[in-house]
Curated annotation (Swiss-Prot):
It comes from Arabidopsis lyrata subsp. lyrata. It holds the Pfam family CASP_dom. It is found in: Cell membrane. The chain crosses the membrane at residues 24-44, 71-91, 116-132, 162-182. This is CASP-like protein ARALYDRAFT_316979.
Length: 186
């Protein structure tokens, strides 16, 4: 016959494992989103010809021409490395049966790191969005047109990359939330 305390212990252990599986899944999602964002941004290059007042102007665009896009690639690189490390550590601990966050210190470290990389991704996405908006709308006080009419593939690559950067931020914020749940449990 089972005592009530044993049943509660089994349920608590099962809940902890589900939370840990969700944490590992969030790490995997962040890794996939940030790696894909980086790959899409690195392939953002195109050449075209724009017609400005009857003059043919050759346009060439590459992600490396903009410091904001370079910042996006750098932020994605750091986040990929961090997420890969956390994912490998989480999978290892799941397979060995030990808790993913064995101490409060490590939980605080994960929380701080998730916040740091989350804000890094948000700032990179915001910086890239400003340049993308300028490319899409053109410069209003000069007669320069928007470049996205001529370089639509480049603009689509950049927009998809920035969408994935913001998705990576959501994964990091969710992972940070689960770490707060671990910290709030006595």
């Amino acid at each position: 016959m089972r005592r009530n305390g044993d049943g509660e212990e089994v349920v608590a252990k099962r809940r902890r494992r589900i939370k840990e599986l969700v944490q590992v899944a969030l790490r995997g999602g962040c890794l996939a989103a940030s790696a894909t964002a980086m790959a899409v941004m690195l392939t953002a290059t195109e050449e075209g010809v724009a017609d400005i007042y009857g003059f043919k102007l050759t346009l060439s665009s590459n992600w490396s021409f903009s410091p904001s896009y370079q910042y996006v690639v750098g932020a994605c690189t750091g986040t990929v490395l961090y997420s890969l490390f956390q994912l490998c550590l989480g999978v290892y601990r799941l397979l060995t049966g030990s808790p993913i966050t064995p101490s409060r210190f490590q939980a605080w470290l994960c929380f701080t790191s998730d916040q740091l990389f989350g804000y890094l991704m948000m700032s990179a996405g915001s910086a890239g969005s400003g340049v993308t908006n300028l490319n899409k709308t053109g410069i209003r006080h000069t007669p320069l047109p928007d470049f996205c009419k001529t370089l639509s593939s480049f603009c689509n690559h950049v927009a998809l990359s920035l969408l994935l950067v913001f998705l990576s931020f959501i994964f990091l914020a969710s992972s940070s939330f689960f770490t707060v749940l671990v910290l709030s449990t006595p």
